[in-house]
Amino acid sequence: MSKKHRVKHPKRKQLGSLKYQISQLRVEPSDQKSKKPMSVSTVKQYKKHAQEFGAWCKEHYKCKTVDACKKHIQDYSDYLRASGKSASTIHTYLAGVCRVLDVPLDTINKPIRVVADNTRSRGTKAVDERKDAGREVSPRLYDFACIAGIRRAEYLHLTPEDLVEDDFVNPCILVRKGKGGKRQLQRILPEELPAIKAVYGNPADANHLFSKDEMNNKIDLHHLRALRAQQMYRYYLNRIQTENGYREQLISEIRHTWEKDDKARKENGYKAKRWSDMKVTGNYILRGNNRKLAKKHGLPLQYDRLALLAVSIFHLSHWRHDVTVANYLLAV
């Protein structure tokens, strides 16, 4: 056939590698009405899980496109379960996969998460026996963490300027960008201030409180965070029960902080949280598996709602009773 009569076929569009295709997908917030885009860290985490899923699809099903991968999300869920992953871990992985690939998470069959079955920072694990998991590997960080009770990533970004006071003149550690990009003030007790000042007086450098070497370890900082939450619950409960007027003072501080946070949320395009006096009234009663776990370990079966919310707001930045109890006070 001569060149003159040769039929030309259009070139097939090159999609790129599966990893590249996933990296180019736009990730939408779960609430489509929200004007605020998802945080960079959340999108990065979701795409990481989606790319891991893509690599699994390529290995097991020779998938080359995102659409081909979508058919195997249920297979991936079954694979994770057979691999011994916990219900919480499976949900975390699938949440990223489904959000990035735009597949409703509720269409995927997966194990039900039970908070009482969580294993993070609970019991003894092999990592706890490692030489780089004890206090001696980084005593300055360890002792500071026992008081601060923040997340590992947040220690990395502390600066020598982050020792401040809140609106009630309580000494606080300023976390400029916590989980989800939230700014938070981590309360410390006045009697703990000298120990904290000693660390701030000897920073790693002009921009970091702790060096990379100090952070390079396997210390279970989440466990120390849970211990701090338990300590502060006892602290607030004792003052509520023994000091005249302290309950009213604490409620006033919480309401002020709540309203200030709501104002910031509105300015950033988020809905305000709904306040109810029930949040600081009566006791939070454990039920179901959490109640069984508490009984097994001889822990309280109910918690003072006011003391609980104080811990959740001033020390964990979760703003919720249930998360505080299940993930911190029951972390044994």
Regions found by a protein language model. Give the residues of each.
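Non-catalytic DNA-binding core/recognition domains of DNA-processing enzymes
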Residues: 34-105, 303, 313-316
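Flexible interdomain linker/hinge and immediately adjacent N-terminus
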Residues: 74-78, 82, 99-134, 176-179
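Basic, Lys/Arg- and aromatic-enriched nucleic-acid-binding interface segment
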Residues: 124-152, 291-296, 303-306
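Short, charged phosphate-coordinating catalytic segments
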Residues: 145-169, 323-327
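Short, basic/aromatic-rich helical patch in the C-terminal catalytic core of site-specific tyrosine
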Residues: 155, 224-237, 312-313
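Conserved tyrosine-mediated DNA breakage-rejoining catalytic core shared by Y-recombinases
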Residues: 157-195
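Short functional hotspots where side chains directly engage DNA or cofactors
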Residues: 170-175, 279-288, 292-332
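Mixed-charge, low-complexity intrinsically disordered segments
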Residues: 235-307
